[in-house]
Amino acid sequence: MSKPLTIALSKGRILKETLPLLKAAGIELLEDPAASRKLIFDTTRDDVKIIIIRATDVPPYVQHGAADIGVAGKDVLMEHGGDGVFEPVDLDIARCKLMVAAMKDAPETGSRLRVATKFVNVAKAYYAQQGKQAEVIKLYGAMELAPLVGLADRIVDIVDTGNTLRANGLEPTELIAHISTRVIVNRASMKTRHSDIQTILDKLVEAVASRKAG
């Protein structure tokens, strides 16, 4: 018997919204991950295991073959670069926007911007495409604070409702990308386990369509 397929799921909001889709596709965890300290979970299918990890770890796990399939936000995939993986399915969940934001009524800066973000690669590529020089400062949280204390002119961050920005005197100024949750697949696994993986992908596509239909 071949080894089980491994699916890597992102912790947090994406996990909560992904589990019902997997259930509809015939894959259900045998125990509640919220009540367990486990990292590897058995499922209702003997040939499928699930690991639950940080969102930013999903792409490298799939890229290097530690997981055959992964589920992560498009923002994480953009930052990672997508090397070594296919991105065949948009689950259309955890939707938001990746945006540039600045202080309200902020004056135009000079030729060089200072930008705070955890999406360093995305920010550098975005400003390079615009022909603008930008010093990108990597932060890990509370991006809204950076313009308030003069650390940065702009931030690049995920925006859902925009309430946190407005509460701190900031406003979104430029849209970089619409974000949703995607399924990624290891390139080698897609060749060696094509039938098994494609069956799961097809069922997920059906589950997404059914969810949209209401």
UniProtKB/Swiss-Prot annotation:
Location(s), subcellular: Cytoplasm
Domain notes: Lacks the C-terminal regulatory region which is replaced by HisZ.
Alphabetized SUPFAM superfamilies for the sequence: Periplasmic binding protein-like II
PANTHER family, per the entry: ATP PHOSPHORIBOSYLTRANSFERASE, ATP PHOSPHORIBOSYLTRANSFERASE ATP-PRTASE
Reactions mediated catalytically: 1-(5-phospho-beta-D-ribosyl)-ATP + diphosphate = 5-phospho-alpha-D-ribose 1-diphosphate + ATP
Source taxonomy: Bacteria, Pseudomonadati, Pseudomonadota, Gammaproteobacteria, Oceanospirillales
Listed InterPro entries: ATP_PRibTrfase_cat, ATP_PRibTrfase_CS, ATP_PRibTrfase_HisG, ATP_PRibTrfase_HisG_short
The protein's enzyme class: transferase
Keywords per UniProt: Amino-acid biosynthesis, ATP-binding, Cytoplasm, Glycosyltransferase, Histidine biosynthesis, Nucleotide-binding, Transferase
Superkingdom field: Bacteria
Entry's family note: Belongs to the ATP phosphoribosyltransferase family. Short subfamily.
Subunit structure: Heteromultimer composed of HisG and HisZ subunits.
Protein name, entry field: ATP phosphoribosyltransferase
Claim: Transferase is one of the keywords in the record: yes
Species, as recorded: Alcanivorax borkumensis (strain ATCC 700651 / DSM 11573 / NCIMB 13689 / SK2)
Gene coding for it: hisG
